[in-house]
Every structure is written in C-alpha cells, then in structure tokens.
Regions:
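Alpha-helical structural modules in large enzymes and assemblies
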Residues: 1-485
C-alpha cells in the first residue's frame, strides 16, 4: 500500500509544475528520532501537502540530512530538467539544517538552484531557542532540567495535588513536538519559584509513597536553588516574550517585506536590550574580605556571561538567516486585490523586478503586460488572494492568455508562507507529529503513517486496492503462490 501510494504521488508531481519540500526532525513517544519529508504542490488548482516518508537518522549532521532529503527528491524528480521544479525548502530542528554556510539548505540548493529557503508557518518560531539548545551544552542542560518540572507533575495525580496546594495552577505540559509550550514553562517556573520551592519541600517531608518521587523532588529543588539555573531562567524569561510577540506578528494575513523588516529590526533590538542586562544576571562576586593577599579571580561568572552573549548571537543570526529570503512575500503583494486600483495608476515595477530575479523561469516582459491587464479590469478586483485569482483564471479558460500570471500564482501558492494558511491546506507536518504519539518499526511506521495521514488521497486514488493486490501477488519471495495460469 505504501509503495502504491508513493507511486501515485510521483505521478502527481510529474504532472505539476512546481514543488516545495518541508522537512523536520521529530520524535515518537519512545524518543526515537525520525526525519519526516513532506512534499507540497498543486493538484487541479488546489495545494496539497503529501506525506512522503520517515527516515531514520544515524547521524544528525548537515551532510547526512541533506543526503536523506536528496534521496527522497531524486525519486520524485528523477530527471535533470525536473530539478527546476523545486522552488522552496523549509526546515526545522537542528541548527545544521538552516545555516547560511554549509547548512542543509545550502547543500540542497547546489542541486536545486531555484529552491529558496523560507520560513514555514508549520514551524514554531520557538525553534530559535532550540538552536541555542542544540549548540550550547550548558543551555541544552538548562532546558533538559527545565522540562523535568513538567514531566515530574504529569506522572501522578498525587504530585499534582501537592502542586495545586502550593502553586494553585498546573505547569504547562512539555511536549517535544510543541516547542511553544517551553515559553509558557519558562514563564511559569520563573513566576512561581518560591511556590515551587515550597511544593518540593512539602513533598520531601510529607510524601508517603515511592522514593523516586522524593529523589526527583530533591533534584528539582536543587535546580531552583542553583545560581546557574536561575541565571539562565532569568535570561530566557526576558527573551521568550519577544519570541512570542514576533510569532504573533508573523500570523498577520498580509505579510509584506516592509512589515517583516520592521519586525526583524524590533526583535533584534529587543534581544540586544536583553543582552545588555547580562552583566546584571551574573554580577561579579566581590571578595568576602579585603586582605594583603591577592584576591582570587572567579571566572565562572565571566564564562556564563560569555555563554549568554553567544546565545544572543545565535538567536539573532538564526533569525536573520531564516528570513534572509523574503521576495516571495513581495511577490504575493502583486496579487493583493485591494491594491489593484493603485497598481493600475502606478505599476509596481520594483516588485516585479525582484520577482523576476528570484524566479528566472518567468518571462518578465510578458508578466508585466498580463499584470497590467489584470490591474485594469474590475472583475479581477473581487478576487481575495492568489488562490481565488488562480481559480477564476482557470474557470474562465484564461490559462493561455495569462500564462505567466498563472505560473507566478502557482509558485506563490506552492511556496509555504510564514503565516497561517487556513484557506490552502491544514499542515501535514502537524498531522504527522500527532500521528507520532505512537511508536513502531520503520517500515510499518511509514506504511501506517501513509494510510492514516493520506487516507483521503488513497480513497480517491483509482483502483488502489486492485493495484495493491496485484503488487502483493507478484512479489517473488513468498511461501504461497497467488498467480495461476
């Protein structure tokens, strides 16, 4: 069934003009790391996101991940001329996936030159902090300890009763496929430090049960009394709200490059403001007494301050690289129907120029002429968005007349945008992560994931069951014979 479904996807991609790949590293309930590959393209004017497969990762470096993605792409784009179809790539997870120099996106672009790296709405922006976690060992340890708070209280209703008595609210559950919960966890632990200390002390003294609970409560209590942990908690408590604000701003319906640039500037300024407070997070330790002896110099706080400066740099650097390419946002404004009348008076030549530079498969002069006609006619001003305009042109049998406009519309709709796309499709990546609440062997996982996530696609596939039976019957290494003359 899995192979038949993949062959149908291959045929759909063969018939489509453009393709985007979305990849992410995710875990099942057994914490087994999987790399998932999702393919996004248009079918009969409707955008679809098809689950392709899970791939086990023995190594998490950029070259290994790029090889896995390239192996998947080579199956759906086998010919050299097909490589121009890939116009977007979206990655989440480990830092090696998104570096400007030698990251996965750079390696993939060597083989697929038109595959621009863009931020996808399905990827939580809190992965900026995940980048810090994956690169700096001390911060990775901090988040590991932090997640222990929510894990501790999700194991037992009896523990939750102690928490409710002391804190009056439950901690956000730490779910690895939902990084936005980490921000809530940081804020909750920071705001209720004293209450949590009281709770753990209460458990240590009054717990009547397993010793594991007492041991874990003692460990978490030590975290809340540890100067390093509290310093990092203070830092991320200041950073997290700005990440949440930025994520909310990116959900704006009409997201243009000017607005994005303002958001970038404000976010970078906010991070730099937090960066300036780092010396106050770990203030220098003054000698306990003055003496004729030379005082000892404690460099540990200097090292921790250096780490937080490094984390600040990582956050800013990753954010800038993630939104380095934003021409697709500018191109989308060409089809903002509210601006058609204005464009009819003053044509957006600069936006058209950047669009043609980003997508060389477009004929700039022909596209300009077609857009000028659209801007001048009233019937097109009723279209709300690129999808509606594409459907109108197709239903009106104008695909040949507006061939370059159709091509650009397909590119923009195929490209995952930064904001939510409810009118296009529900994120397949989110459905994959929901499915991964289960765990099983790789082959069975791929097959059952395909049947679960793409059940509608399989139901609509012609003669699917018959083709599965025929493939099964023609398998050579079987104990029983199913074909008779």
């Amino acid at each position: 069934m899995f192979k038949i479904a993949q062959s149908d996807i291959q045929q759909e991609i063969k018939d489509t003009k453009f393709l985007a790949v979305i990849s992410d590293d995710t875990t099942d309930v057994s914490n087994h790391l999987q790399n998932v590959v999702i393919l996004r393209y248009l079918v009969s004017g409707q955008v679809v996101e098809r689950f392709w497969s899970f791939c086990s990762m023995k190594q998490g470096d950029a070259v290994s991940i790029a090889n896995v993605i390239d192996a998947c792409l080579s199956r759906v784009l086998p010919n050299a001329e097909d490589k121009s179809k890939l116009i977007a790539q979206c990655y989440d997870g480990a830092s090696v996936m998104s570096g400007l120099e030698g990251g996965v996106q750079s390696i993939v672009k060597q083989s697929y030159p038109h595959a621009h790296y863009v931020h996808c709405y399905a990827h939580q922006l809190n992965l900026v902090l995940q980048q810090a976690v994956s690169q700096v060992s001390q911060i990775r340890l901090f988040f590991a300890n932090l997640s222990g708070f929510s894990v501790f209280f999700t194991r037992s209703p009896k523990r939750v009763a102690f928490l409710d008595k002391s804190v009056g609210r439950r901690l956000p559950r730490s779910v690895k496929t939902r990084w936005n919960f980490q921000s809530r966890l940081v804020l909750t632990v920071y705001e209720h430090q004293d209450d949590l200390i009281e709770c753990f002390q209460d458990i240590i003294v009054n717990w009547n049960g397993d010793q594991t609970t007492v041991r874990e409560a003692s460990g978490l209590l030590k975290c809340l009394q540890d100067r390093d942990f509290l310093g990092y908690l203070d830092f991320f408590h200041k950073i997290m709200p700005h990440v949440e604000i930025l994520y909310a701003q990116l959900q704006r319906r009409q997201l243009d490059p000017v607005f994005l640039q303002n958001c970038k500037s404000n976010f970078i300024q906010a991070v730099n403001n937090v960066r300036s407070t780092i010396p106050h997070i770990f203030p220098p330790i003054t000698p306990a007494s003055t003496s004729a002896k030379r005082p000892r110099v404690d460099t540990s706080d200097e090292e921790k301050s250096r780490i937080l400066h490094e984390v600040s740099d990582i956050i800013i650097s990753h954010f800038c690289s993630r939104f380095e390419f934003s021409n697709h946002l500018a191109s989308a404004t060409l089809f903002n129907s509210e601006s058609f009348e204005k464009y009819n008076q003053a044509f957006p030549s600069q936006i058209l120029k950047s669009t043609a530079e980003s997508y060389p498969m477009l004929d700039e002069s022909k596209l300009r002429s077609e857009l000028a006609v659209i801007y001048s006619r009233c019937e097109f001003r009723q279209c709300c968005g690129a999808v509606a305009l594409l459907h109108l042109l197709q239903e009106s049998n104008l695909t040949e007349t507006f061939s370059e406009v159709i091509k650009l519309l397909m590119i923009l709709i195929t490209t995952p945008m930064s904001s939510s796309e409810a009118e296009r499709c529900f994120s397949t990546l989110k459905r994959v992560k929901t499915f991964l609440r289960n765990t099983m062997s790789d082959d069975r996982l791929n097959a059952l994931a395909m049947l679960s996530i793409e059940k509608k696609f399989i139901r609509e596939s012609s003669n699917f069951n018959q083709r599965v039976i025929e493939m099964f019957a023609h398998l050579k290494e079987r104990r029983a014979t199913f074909l008779y003359k």
